[in-house]
Regions:
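Residue-level marker for beta-strand->alpha-helix junctions and adjacent short loops that shape enzyme
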Residues: 16-17, 83, 109, 129, ...
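Short Asp/Glu-rich motifs
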Residues: 67-68, 114-115, 235, 295-296, ...
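Radical SAM [4Fe-4S] cluster-binding motif and immediate context
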Residues: 160-331
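Acidic, low-complexity intrinsically disordered segments
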Residues: 2-220
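Catalytic cores of alpha/beta
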Residues: 113-118, 271-273, 333-334
């Protein structure tokens, strides 16, 4: 059996553009933090790397990269979403100018790999399905290449607890965890089903409670966001998880207040609303997109066309949860 080689990995989380909805610069100033949320993707990948590899994280939204960071690093990981594209490209060029091999991955490189051709490595798709292949190649001496995970096949029940220890927690308004990937709906404008598929895959209850235990043991308290794109995508699994989550909260005197994203059909399930409230969910982001039924039909937002949206929102309010509404302004006229 080959012995894993030591490797120093510098993970760089790119800056969001200032005009992006993900920036929240003024809100962060008001709340006395540097960023709303921490980089969950990179710290999850960090947990998948060999134990002989050492990881250092720099969130470029909250801190600057130092000469010592580059001198220490054998390899750089970066990548993110579309609003981070410009800074990701800047970081790739910066790494190349310092003679450091750079690995790029994440949603935007997976969707548009040609834009990131300057990176030494592209690791595309969900990390669980490809990271071991990349690590083996690196340790065998490969110094460039494209590694692509099979689509929609990552086994999230094998995903390790993220490396929360890499974060400067005080920099963030809240932290995040992920329960599921994928969404059963087919909204025309959304890339989630292109990245993760239409069959939501969920972690196990012991996995999720292990993540909460890790945060609790670190001393973290307060707002914790389930970053799932549709938390109720797999209701069958969720109904099994929520009572265990509520029990976990109750035995620890409710250390966390949860938020998440869900489709508006959450309002159709009073029992599910009750279970979320019992687990101490206080807020849900709901994509309303448009009040115009014709526009909703055109964007294939079927779940919003079958109801009185205002009444649905008030049902969620009635369960004791705030609703943050998402709208698309200037959608194509079809």
């Amino acid at each position: 059996m080959n012995t894993p080689c030591p490797c120093n990995v510098l993970m760089l989380y790119p800056r969001f553009t200032a005009d992006s909805v993900w920036s929240f610069a003024e809100s962060c100033k008001l709340m006395g933090v540097r960023r709303p949320a921490a980089p969950l993707g990179l710290i999850t990948v960090a947990a998948m790397l060999p134990g002989s590899w050492t990881v250092r994280l720099v969130d470029c939204n909250t801190a600057s990269i130092t000469d010592d960071d580059f001198a220490w690093a054998d390899l750089v990981f970066t990548g993110g979403m579309l609003p981070q594209q410009a800074d990701t490209l800047r970081l790739i060029e910066l790494c190349r100018s310092r003679g450091k091999p750079v690995v790029v991955g994440g949603p935007d490189p997976t969707s548009s790999p040609h834009i990131y051709a300057a990176a030494d490595f592209q690791v595309l798709g969900e990390a669980e399905g490809v990271i071991d292949e990349f690590v083996a190649a690196w340790e065998s001496g490969v110094r460039s290449g494209v590694f692509t995970a099979p689509k929609f096949q990552a086994d999230v029940t094998k995903t390790p607890v993220p490396r929360f220890d890499l974060l400067n927690i005080q920099d963030y308004l809240y932290l995040g965890v992920q329960y599921s990937r994928g969404c059963p709906f087919t909204c025309e404008f959304c890339d989630i089903i292109e990245l993760y598929g239409r069959v939501p895959r969920t972690k196990t209850t012991p996995q999720m409670l292990a993540e909460l235990d890790a945060l609790y043991d670190m001393g973290y308290r307060g707002h914790l966001d389930f970053v799932d794109d549709n938390f109720i995508g797999n209701k069958k699994s969720l109904r099994l998880f929520l009572p265990e989550l509520a029990d976990w909260q109750r035995t620890r005197d409710y250390p966390f207040e949860f938020s998440t994203e869900a489709s508006v059909n959450l309002a159709d399930d009073p029992k599910l609303l009750e279970m979320m409230a019992a687990a101490n969910f206080f807020g849900v982001f709901v994509g309303i997109e448009s009040p115009d039924p014709a526009t909703l039909v055109a964007m294939k937002k079927k779940q919003n066309t079958r109801r009185n949206i205002a009444e649905s929102i008030h049902k969620i309010y009635g369960a004791g949860m705030l609703v943050t509404a998402g709208f698309i302004v200037g959608f194509d006229k079809l």
